[in-house]
Amino acid sequence: MYSWKSKFKFGKSKEEKEAKHSGFFHSSKKEEQQNNQATAGEHDASITRSSLDRKGTINPSNSSVVPVRVSYDASSSTSTVRDSNGGNSENTNSSQNLDETANIGSTGTPNDATSSSGMMTIKVYNGDDFILPFPITSSEQILNKLLASGVPPPHKEISKEVDALIAQLSRVQIKNQGPADEDLISSESAAKFIPSTIMLPGSSTLNPLLYFTIEFDNTVATIEAEYGTIAKPGFNKISTFDVTRKLPYLKIDVFARIPSILLPSKTWQQEMGLQDEKLQTIFDKINSNQDIHLDSFHLPINLSFDSAASIRLYNHHWITLDNGLGKINISIDYKPSRNKPLSIDDFDLLKVIGKGSFGKVMQVRKKDTQKVYALKAIRKSYIVSKSEVTHTLAERTVLARVDCPFIVPLKFSFQSPEKLYFVLAFINGGELFYHLQKEGRFDLSRARFYTAELLCALDNLHKLDVVYRDLKPENILLDYQGHIALCDFGLCKLNMKDDDKTDTFCGTPEYLAPELLLGLGYTKAVDWWTLGVLLYEMLTGLPPYYDEDVPKMYKKILQEPLVFPDGFDRDAKDLLIGLLSRDPTRRLGYNGADEIRNHPFFSQLSWKRLLMKGYIPPYKPAVSNSMDTSNFDEEFTREKPIDSVVDEYLSESVQKQFGGWTYVGNEQLGSSMVQGRSIR
């Protein structure tokens, strides 16, 4: 468990920051650096950093309101559907070309971005032909007990179902497999004798051994099997998604929780694992009680139309997964919304996950779709008093425009006479900084994976003429599967063309680029410097020019040579030399992100596959489900979630500054002022 308190220091007064968050700095209090004037802090005897051992972010002004660094993830809300008469319609499989079917652009957007928002309802009926990628034990005693704990289909007696399966088991062909010549049930037959859901003795709780996730716009629903076997699971579930961006596909991932007692002997696992690295990874996860990823699929959806009526996109459609390990029967309906204004009353408040002088952040559930989000409430009077209206509106603008799977998306924004509200995807895998602190450093493949996803996120911002300016592990979240989610856009600079320069002194001391320290003005290339610093820190545990004394650290950034530990990867070293060039015009990425993409360090990556989240992340955060709040400080989560009443009058001229705040999936809605009611 780690503290998230430091994430909520932004937007607080200077006195609050010093009193409550002095631990965020190195041992002693460090003043924020302004206008290129650095003040020396006291030394700490230890150079090992913790989550409280970090230089503070340098804001453009003392009163900057920077978005709260919250962890969000997707909801897994589903309801039961009993319309399970799955008819056979056309089958979709991995041979379909998504580029042709769904009109995927380089950023994953559909061609028509102007159609209205709405709700997409997915009905999941059943699965078929699922197999496991490995054989299992042939022990009848183990399999009989497992079958007896399984859940039968509706209206069928469990004893008859178990007897039928046990009878089949007695006739199944046992094969001598592997170097150990072990008697095993083949992978093709194994799934027929493992229940998809079990009920432990003395318990009425269902424990699914097979489930899959449906992801749309960083919101995730978890669909768990209710009955049947892994080969033929029954689901009968409904899940509804809010559609605010017309993305061209759904991402489906299938997972299994296989009891380790079903695996072949340790000797067999070791010998076969030496021959097949992927198989060894599967065995390692099962033996560590982790879920294994079986298969995936990207289902094309066409939401680019103008219609006020509900439309069925798929009707009892069979989806064959990419690797052919099974298929799923679904229907999908889309219903355009009426673009009615939202209010806080449209959400159930679940938990407080952060607080500050600006207001609070809560985990909420949208009442109509039952999807879980993070809602950030900001008091208007606070940001007016801090002269931060422009920055806050800019933050909302960036969040509404970004279109990248590795950036936390804005789902909605709305306002009342007293407050502004952000509704964002809820991502709960924790800060990258926490995971880096816990492990010290990452291996090469893990660091490469995170760097590649961040490269896509920064490139997406640059294409929108936005400079991020504050890349660091604290501003990077992991979703429940382990993908990157970039957050905190309070220091972004908008309307920055390729050759434009700005000279605002802001960022985080360890990550400041030389041109920023010299006050020469900087371009988008400043983000590639910070990407290099982050990659170096992930591989070594510390930023390249780190020093306890801030002025000394700045001097190192400007003058000291880049040093690498012994045995450092050659391609990683060459990439870092390019990214950490002190001359921004010679820095890798100065002429565009493709310069970085084409570097040998990423030669084994398919960028198209990466953008579609087609790679299995190297690490999956330890969260029980997509609503898990264990990565948030209990000081917040224990508090009763309420939207506190604010009795603060703001004049009409002040209220007009917040015009255009509302976002429900398009930018056509203006801002209507209705006293005492929710404001659009």
From Swiss-Prot:
Result of altering G490R: Reduced sphingolipid biosynthesis inhibitor drug myriocin (ISP-1) resistance. Defective in growth and endocytosis
Record: residues binding ATP: I353, G354, K355, G356, S357, F358, G359, K360, V361, K376
Listed Polar residues bias regions: 73-83, 98-117
PROSITE patterns given in the database record: AGC_KINASE_CTER (PS51285), PROTEIN_KINASE_ATP (PS00107), PROTEIN_KINASE_DOM (PS50011), PROTEIN_KINASE_ST (PS00108)
CC annotations in GO: cellular bud neck; cytosol; plasma membrane
Amino acid composition bias (Low complexity), ranges on this chain: 59-71, 84-97
CDD domains: YPK1_N_like
Gene Ontology MF, one: protein kinase regulator activity
Basic and acidic residues biased stretches: 12-21, 41-56
Residue intervals passing through the bilayer: none
Modified residues (Phosphothreonine): T57, T502, T504, T662
EC class name: transferase
Biased amino acid composition, Basic residues: 1-11
Reported impact of T662 to A/D: No phosphorylation
Covalent S-S links between cysteines: none
Region spans: Disordered: 1-117
Alphabetical list of InterPro entries matching this protein: AGC-kinase_C, Kinase-like_dom_sf, Pkinase_C, Prot_kinase_dom, Protein_kinase_ATP_BS, Ser/Thr_kinase_AS
Domain of life: Eukaryota
UniProt KW keywords: ATP-binding, Cell membrane, Cell wall biogenesis/degradation, Cytoplasm, Endocytosis, Kinase, Lipid metabolism, Membrane, Nucleotide-binding, Phosphoprotein, Serine/threonine-protein kinase, Sphingolipid metabolism, Transferase
Signal peptide region: none
Stated regulation of activity: Activated by phytosphingosine (PHS), a sphingoid long chain base. Activated by PKH1 phosphorylation.
Topology term for the membrane: Peripheral membrane protein
UniProt-listed GO biological process terms: cell wall organization; cellular response to acetate; eisosome assembly; endocytosis; glycerophospholipid metabolic process; intracellular signal transduction; negative regulation of phospholipid translocation; negative regulation of sphingolipid biosynthetic process
Reported impact of K376 to A/R: No kinase activity. ATP-binding defect. Internalization defects
Stated consequence of mutating T662A: No phosphorylation. Reduced sphingolipid biosynthesis inhibitor drug myriocin (ISP-1) resistance. No defect in growth or endocytosis
Protein name: Serine/threonine-protein kinase YPK1
